[in-house]
């Protein structure tokens, strides 16, 4: 489906329209600072493309169970793996600490909203738990979540660990989508 964001992504050389969600959030909340960035669920790669452009110092580590179509010569590492597996977590930990963790990952959808939101919840909680292990003090975390399940539990977890917490629905989210983003800034209160 070619909407205005899809066409804009093609024109500007991004791999997916989802990049405009990250751009909008970053313009409002200044996610990037010096330090390493971790992109969990990086495929197809548009979040990583933008993150790489925004690197001030440090490296970008992109993780996904699928390959992504990005290769950069410097300051970029791709880890093909599942964040639920120890081997992948070990590789992620090799580059810690991170000043920012971003995730636009979504589970494979079934069409059953209850199942999909439950799977999104489990995936989001895993990303948060992993982020708590690898984030720098005062680091930032951005995670996509499907609405309609236990997202308030996720929000409360953010509030426990971050000084600033915000629920965001960027303009680039499709009208019929039930995705939102949770942002936590200044880890470690």
UniProtKB/Swiss-Prot annotation:
The active site is at 144 (proton acceptor). Its main location: cytoplasm. It catalyses: uridine(2552) in 23S rRNA + S-adenosyl-L-methionine = 2'-O-methyluridine(2552) in 23S rRNA + S-adenosyl-L-homocysteine + H(+). Pfam families: FtsJ. One of its GO terms (cellular component) is cytoplasm. Its EC number is 2.1.1.166. It comes from the Bacteria. Specifically methylates the uridine in position 2552 of 23S rRNA at the 2'-O position of the ribose in the fully assembled 50S ribosomal subunit. HAMAP family: RNA_methyltr_E. Belongs to the class I-like SAM-binding methyltransferase superfamily. RNA methyltransferase RlmE family. This is Ribosomal RNA large subunit methyltransferase E.
